[in-house]
């Protein structure tokens, strides 16, 4: 029988076509049958990139080029305005909603940066034609200039950013956007997914902690340090990714959260990439199993 390590190695060296094609489900099931969420984080092959993984990433960049143009520019106004981008699928009926939270490089109010640079992976993978064919969904990419974590309001007025427990200002506003979209479009409330990288990964922990049992699943890449310790909303399926050579957010941050979540009764999946620095999103969002795993999750 395939071991957990063999399964992840196989996924890491899958063919370019298998990375995005619907037929990938055939080996995803076997890989997860061999995986147990109680095991230590799987150490997957990492830097220097194998030719197979490099081919996957380059193929993704080529196939996804220009997909950002399919996002509609919108904004939610209020006490402060949150710009956001929305992809609307061609399919009809109740459909899932994927929410992507950008990293610090996506901050601002231009409604552009959250789709560019390192964010291309997390915002475009869902739009690939083969993924939309099998897993049609709405995709939301909000942009925050307030971060995603919760900052002490009194100190924030003085320009001091001190994180404290509670719903983040940016995260809370993004949830307002989500709720507005649920009223405007036929979103499947049982299949709302959230994910993010770096600062957005920390924001993902903030969201699932402070709005428990709302999201069907979460995918987190190198989540930044926030007051959230990983124990919030333990029923929510989580797949956490981190490079073991991350010089920006130490891998220990993810290890501690995953350990705490398991101790509290949760069952998160965790994958570490050997030799990979902070750009783990290039690996995570081209992981052949991720798309199939995500859309298999359903709340309730």
Predicted regions and their residues:
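Gly/Ser-rich "nucleophile elbow"/oxyanion-hole loop immediately N-terminal to the catalytic nucleophile
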Residues: 153-197
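Primarily recognizes the serine-hydrolase "nucleophile elbow" in alpha/beta-hydrolase
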Residues: 190-232
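C-terminal catalytic histidine-bearing segment of alpha/beta-hydrolase fold enzymes
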Residues: 237, 241, 247-300
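The conserved beta1-alpha1 loop
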Residues: 101-102, 242
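Active-site machinery of serine-nucleophile hydrolases
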Residues: 106-171
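A domain-start/cap signature at the N-terminus of enzymes
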Residues: 12, 34-97, 137, 170, ...
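N-terminal export signals
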Residues: 6-32
């Amino acid at each position: 029988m395939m071991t957990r390590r063999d399964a992840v190695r196989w996924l890491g060296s899958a063919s370019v076509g298998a990375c995005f094609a619907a037929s990938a489900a055939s080996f995803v099931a076997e890989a997860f049958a061999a995986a147990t969420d109680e095991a230590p984080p799987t150490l997957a092959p990492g830097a220097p990139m194998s030719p197979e993984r490099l081919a996957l990433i380059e193929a993704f960049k080529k196939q996804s080029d220009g997909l950002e143009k399919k996002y509609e520019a919108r904004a939610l106004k209020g006490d402060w305005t949150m710009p956001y981008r929305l992809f609307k699928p061609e399919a009809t009926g109740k459909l899932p909603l994927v929410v992507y939270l950008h990293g610090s490089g996506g901050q601002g109010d231009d409604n552009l940066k959250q789709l560019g640079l390192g964010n291309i992976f997390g915002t475009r993978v869902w739009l690939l034609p083969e993924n939309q064919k099998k897993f049609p969904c709405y995709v939301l990419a909000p942009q925050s200039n307030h971060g995603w974590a919760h900052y002490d309001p009194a100190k924030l007025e003085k320009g001091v950013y001190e994180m404290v427990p509670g719903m983040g200002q940016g995260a809370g506003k993004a949830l307002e956007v989500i709720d507005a979209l649920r009223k405007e479009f036929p979103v499947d409330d049982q299949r709302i997914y959230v994910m993010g990288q770096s600062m957005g990964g920390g924001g993902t922990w903030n969201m699932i902690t402070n709005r428990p049992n709302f999201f069907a699943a979460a995918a987190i890449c190198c989540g930044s340090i926030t007051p959230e310790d990983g124990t919030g909303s333990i029923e929510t399926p989580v797949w956490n990714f981190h490079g073991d050579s991350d010089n920006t957010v130490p891998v220990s941050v993810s290890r501690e959260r995953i350990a705490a979540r398991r101790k509290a009764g949760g069952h998160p999946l965790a994958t570490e990439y050997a030799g990979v620095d902070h750009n783990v999103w290039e690996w995570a969002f081209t992981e052949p199993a991720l798309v199939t795993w995500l859309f298999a999750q359903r709340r309730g």
